[in-house]
Amino acid sequence: MLLNFGVVTLLGGAVASVLVAERLKGDDTLDESKFSGHLVIAGWNATVPSILKLIDANEDSTDVIILVNETDRDIIQRAVTGYERLDITHISENFTHESVLRKAFLEKAGTFMILPDNSGLLPHEEPDEDKTVLTCLTAKSISESCNVVAHVLDVENVSHLQRANANEIVIPDEHVPHL
């Protein structure tokens, strides 16, 4: 009898643990109806809050934004608070995968920005810009009409992004000195 009580207790604890983990993880399905002409930002670095501030200040820009990166949800939540006009959704997955970009409704997006991704990097580490080129190729295979803006740190990657049909290529020293 004591053994049965122990087994039931362990089983109940395991079920409760699974249910709590699912509740904390949240529901990652998005309502497709509000995503049309929206902005998708892939990658995370120190310039994202400045970009969001510019978008928030521009009344003519879209207010629906999807952030796709592997940065911790708490960091993203703290960074995006205070943008009253913007409807920001975070997908915490690897943006180089086609399935993840489809989850962000890239085929319906107005603009897709690819930024150097500092997710999980130490302060002295540089982001892998091959991910930018790969993501641009993946995005164009999903939606040729999507406006892809790629941000690179190394000028040598510009030719690769041109071959990948990026609509705009941003090089920090040349384009965004105020960020």
Predicted regions and their residues:
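Cytosolic regulatory regions of ion transport systems
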Residues: 1-179
